[in-house]
């Protein structure tokens, strides 16, 4: 899967773009841009940042893909993103509401009841659920813990299809439906959806690796090829991912595949285990700062603007009010920080120079250009930062006291001593380069 830190370029893709069908182009999309009905499904077609997103509504349940359900609240987030009347500031505050990861990289669960399964099949189901847990946790920081009294957890039910809710949501129980009880990797696939992981073919950079022609897909299946723009993909596109579909999936005619490689060749899927890319993706999505083990980790914060410039405590001073600046990369403690969880999704960013001092929005400011400084931790909202995991594009940071603003390098300048400030988001999905930072663990 290689979930989602570096922008890739593809000249070959640019040459091919003019001759392929593209769901983002209204001229080549045969589905009318409105809500349509198909048998028992209502198909919602939403235009988000110039690209179409499909959601199938069936009996009041929203399907973001054939096997991914989203809550009414998540559907509302998509509608707000698609609404041209929604301001950029409002969009920037809701973008993190669509998919959330599990706190402390811990997923609580309950095992299924036997239901209509024979004793033999029921035992097989239980065994393979545990194999799926082991498969995921064996090379990641994820923990699966049997529920006691937790409010948010996952459950399993044997049904006639496979599906899972997408990501963690407060006060929600994620009911995972499983038909293929004899395949641990398929169960793992659905668990990974509950962890907040999308299908590989939905990466926004997919067009650098594959050609997708949704006009060859059966009616009502286009939601399986939605582009998820909030996450840039981690590492290279992974054809061996357990989250990847094959060329002919959902095709009207198997001789006319929906997806091919750039050279026109086809590919198959595998459901035997997680790939190296899947493990790397999980470890990025749930790290470096989402995992409990990372609380004591130390990181540098490099700007995406340049490979040799880091966030820096000016003059290595620990005096309250010391400026946070951009400076040439070094190994000094003035460029090393630890992340400590405060609220779900929010972190304090401590200086290694003095762990009682944290990155703070000056004077609790909420206006564009307000400086960021070092100050004694008082547990205020101006000292808590919401992290946006952007995969290959690094991380974005929003202060809790001003959620519509983002940590940025002032004016996008890479000169030494440039102030680090909070600024208005100028893009609704992926932040601009000056608002993206690469976290590198140094010990």
Regions found by a protein language model. Give the residues of each.
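Positively charged n-region of N-terminal signal peptides that target proteins for export
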Residues: 1-4
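Sec-dependent N-terminal signal peptides
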Residues: 6-11
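C-terminal motif of bacterial Sec signal peptides marking the signal peptidase cleavage site
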Residues: 15-18
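Extracellular interaction modules
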Residues: 151, 237-238, 274-279, 330-334, ...
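Short, solvent-exposed loop/turn segments at the edges of secondary structure
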Residues: 171, 205-207, 238, 332, ...
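Extracellular glycan-recognition/adhesion modules and their associated mucin-like linkers
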Residues: 290-318, 333-366, 381-414, 431-443
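Surface-exposed turn/loop modules enriched in turn-prone residues
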Residues: 319-333, 369-378, 423-428
């Amino acid at each position: 899967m290689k979930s989602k830190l570096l922008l890739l370029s593809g000249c070959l893709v640019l040459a091919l773009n003019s001759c392929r069908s593209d769901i983002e182009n209204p001229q080549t999309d045969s589905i009318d841009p409105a809500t349509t009905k198909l048998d028992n499904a209502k198909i919602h077609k939403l235009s988000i940042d110039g690209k179409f997103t499909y959601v199938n509504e069936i009996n009041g349940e929203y399907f973001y893909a054939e096997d991914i359900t989203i809550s009414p609240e998540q559907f509302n987030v998509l509608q707000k993103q698609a609404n041209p009347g929604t301001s950029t500031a409002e969009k920037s505050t809701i973008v993190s509401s669509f998919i959330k990861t599990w706190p402390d990289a811990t997923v609580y669960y309950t095992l299924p009841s036997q239901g209509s399964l024979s004793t033999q099949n029921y035992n097989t189901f239980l065994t393979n659920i545990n194999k799926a847990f082991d498969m995921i946790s064996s090379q990641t920081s994820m923990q699966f813990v049997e529920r006691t009294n937790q409010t948010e957890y996952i459950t399993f039910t044997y049904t006639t299809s496979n599906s899972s809710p997408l990501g963690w949501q407060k006060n929600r129980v994620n009911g995972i439906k499983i038909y293929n009880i004899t395949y641990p990797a398929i169960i793992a696939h659905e668990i990974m959806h509950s962890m907040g992981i999308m299908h590989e073919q939905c990466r926004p950079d997919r067009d650098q690796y594959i050609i997708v022609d949704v006009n060859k897909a059966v009616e009502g299946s286009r939601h399986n090829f939605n582009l998820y723009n909030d996450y840039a993909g981690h590492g290279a596109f992974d054809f061996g991912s357990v989250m990847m579909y094959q060329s002919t999936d959902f095709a009207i005619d198997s001789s006319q595949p929906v997806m091919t490689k750039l050279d026109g060749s086809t590919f198959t899927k595998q459901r035997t285990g997680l790939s190296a890319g899947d493990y790397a993706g999980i470890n990025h999505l749930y790290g470096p700062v989402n995992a409990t083990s990372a609380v004591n980790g130390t990181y540098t914060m490099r700007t995406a603007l340049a490979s040799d410039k880091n966030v820096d405590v000016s003059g290595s001073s620990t005096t309250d009010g010391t400026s946070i600046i951009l400076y040439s990369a070094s190994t000094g403690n003035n460029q090393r920080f630890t992340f400590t969880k405060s609220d779900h999704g929010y972190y304090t960013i401590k200086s290694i120079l003095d762990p009682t001092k944290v990155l703070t929005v000056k004077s609790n400011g909420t206006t564009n250009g307000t400086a960021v400084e070092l100050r004694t931790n008082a547990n205020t909202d101006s000292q808590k930062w919401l992290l946006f995991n952007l995969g290959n594009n690094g991380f974005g940071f929003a202060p809790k006291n001003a959620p519509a603003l983002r940590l940025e390098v002032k004016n996008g300048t890479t000169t030494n001593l440039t102030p680090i400030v909070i600024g208005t988001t100028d893009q609704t999905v992926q932040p601009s380069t000056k608002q993206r930072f690469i976290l590198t663990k140094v010990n």
